[in-house]
Amino acid sequence: MFPMVTGFMNYGQQTVRAARYIGQSFMITLSHANRLPVTIQYPYEKSITSERFRGRIHFEFDKCIACEVCVRVCPIDLPVVDWRLETDIRKKRLLNYSIDFGICIFCGNCVEYCPTNCLSMTEEYELSTYDRHELNYNQIALGRLPMSVIGDYTVRTIMNSTQIKISMDKPLDSRTITN
């Protein structure tokens, strides 16, 4: 007789425990119901990238000393640096610099270890093309600065926080919007 009673008690405890778990998960589901939607209409609305976002690499040809530190610290030896040794002044002269963004993993080591700060990360993330050979950027393509998403009047940016008061005296940048 007692084993049957303990079996019913165990069944009752398991039923109560299951109902509690279902109730807890239902409460979590309901708590997400009052949040704002996360989906944005991408080509027309763009989210503002963070300050530390690793986008396309910007290269300044005049600052580069062809030391090849960027190639040595790159985990996949990606940047291609072509240089010639000028014997009269005994310095390297940079001829060509290119990065293939189809292979780049955007780790940022080249930017971090560059001694002359000729490399920097931009907020540009739209690098998609139909031909993978178009992702091989030379020093001319790397030297172009992308148009800022914040300053682009054709795109409506999505601010992740609630209404932010921005004074029009200061220029818009990612720091004034996120603060």
Curated annotation (Swiss-Prot):
A Pfam family (short name) is: Fer4_7
Q: What is its EC number?
A: 7.1.1.-
- Keywords from the named record: 4Fe-4S, Chloroplast, Iron, Iron-sulfur, Membrane, Metal-binding, NAD, NADP, Plastid, Plastoquinone, Quinone, Repeat, Thylakoid, Translocase
Kindly list the cofactors needed: [4Fe-4S] cluster
Q: Does the keyword Metal-binding apply?
A: yes
Q: Which GO terms describe its biological process?
A: photosynthesis, light reaction
Instruction: List GO terms (cellular component aspect).
Output: chloroplast thylakoid membrane
Instruction: Relay the cofactor remark from the entry.
Output: Binds 2 [4Fe-4S] clusters per subunit.
Q: Where in the cell is it found?
A: Plastid, Chloroplast thylakoid membrane
Cite the record's note on assembly.
Answer: NDH is composed of at least 16 different subunits, 5 of which are encoded in the nucleus.
The protein's name is NAD(P)H-quinone oxidoreductase subunit I, chloroplastic
Q: Gene that codes for this?
A: ndhI
